[in-house]
Amino acid sequence: MNILERAALTALHRMDPEKAHSLSLSALRSGLVPLPGPVTSPRLATVVGGLVLPNPVGLAAGYDKNAVALAALMRAGFGFLEVGAATPRPQPGNPQPRLFRLTEDRAAINRFGFNNDGAATICARLAMRPRGAVPVGLNLGANKDSPDRAADFAAVLAACGPHADFATVNVSSPNTERLRDLQGRQALTALLEGVMQVQAGFARPVPVFLKIAPDLSDADLAEIAEVALASGIAGIVATNTTLARDGLRSAHARETGGLSGAPLFERSTRVLARLSELTEGRLPLIGVGGVASAEEAYAKIRAGASAVQLYTAMVYQGIGLAARIARGLDALLLRDGFGSVAEAVGTGRADWLT
């Protein structure tokens, strides 16, 4: 991390977390943030669920909810971006305060509740983004007051799919009441059928991923793996934030909401490895949760991920983190004799299944 980035982070950490978040996006949009540009190599370039990625380090949904800083983020060293979640209608989300830094734990808790500008506005921004080598996907959400949340996911995909490189069905946010109920076999099967019917009508392929919670039993994971394999989706994103609070030291540890960051790493990686075992490598997995270094990204890949995503770690290490992780990952692959990311996927899975 350079001196400028460190100074900016110090200033941001003196602000309310949500205001700091908004200011960081404004700084990116205005061109005030030095950006490293694309990061790739023959080892890092990979294909995940039909997406051609310059590197496997992605931006998780939730940072740029409304797709306002895409041009800058495409130059920030990420191999792919995910914006949203978008819901059919705009909604304000839950009352503030709803974002909390847990500095001692290198973590955050949020209870945003899918606050966003709505699908129509976000779709328009996706359509106007610069085209390049970095795929941009959309996280699909449901309105809090919707009488048919499953239909909401299909509606957002229908509206925005033509302007997105991929889409992620988010049934795992803990901040919309009963949303996680859609992870059950019957509900999930019906939901994915509706989404895939919409996808089938597009003129070009738009891979669909499913984002799951980390707070699932082995039986739950087995059901999800079975449904996912039968549905025709492109892959699974594992995982969203957790409701667990094990071992936290920060004053905000008991705030309601989803916990992200370093404390999530082991829990989410064990879920990832279990899914890799259940799907027998037939379904690409994207590992999310606590990735803050090249070593942690590499661990996720060796546990079964074809790519990774990060967000909370940037709160503590800055926007340059993605490029640093990608370069470090390249060095780790070279060190261990892997010619590509794909060669390393799942090679350490057994370590996470004990």
From Swiss-Prot:
MF annotations from Gene Ontology: dihydroorotate dehydrogenase (quinone) activity
Q: Tell me the Gene Ontology biological-process terms attached to this UniProt entry.
A: 'de novo' pyrimidine nucleobase biosynthetic process; 'de novo' UMP biosynthetic process
CDD domains named in the record: DHOD_2_like
Recorded GO cellular component terms are: cytoplasm; plasma membrane
Topology within the bilayer: Peripheral membrane protein
Entry EC no(s)? 1.3.5.2
Question: Pathway, per Swiss-Prot/TrEMBL?
Answer: Pyrimidine metabolism; UMP biosynthesis via de novo pathway; orotate from (S)-dihydroorotate (quinone route): step 1/1
| Catalytic residues of the enzyme | 173
Identify the residues that bind substrate: 65, 110-114, 170, 175, 240-241
| Location of the protein in the cell | Cell membrane
Q: Which reaction does it catalyse?
A: (S)-dihydroorotate + a quinone = orotate + a quinol
What the entry lists under Pfam families is as follows: DHO_dh
Q: Where does FMN bind?
A: 61-65, 85, 139, 170, 211, 239, 261, 290, 311-312
Q: What class of enzyme is it?
A: oxidoreductase
Q: Which cofactor does it need?
A: FMN
Q: What is its main location?
A: membrane
Under HAMAP family, the record lists:
DHO_dh_type2
User: According to its UniProt record, which protein family does this protein belong to?
Assistant: Belongs to the dihydroorotate dehydrogenase family. Type 2 subfamily.
Quaternary form? Answer: Monomer.
Q: What does this protein do?
A: Catalyzes the conversion of dihydroorotate to orotate with quinone as electron acceptor.
Give the protein's recorded name.
Answer: Dihydroorotate dehydrogenase (quinone)
Q: What is the lineage of its organism?
A: Bacteria, Pseudomonadati, Pseudomonadota, Alphaproteobacteria, Rhodobacterales
The gene from which this protein is expressed is pyrD
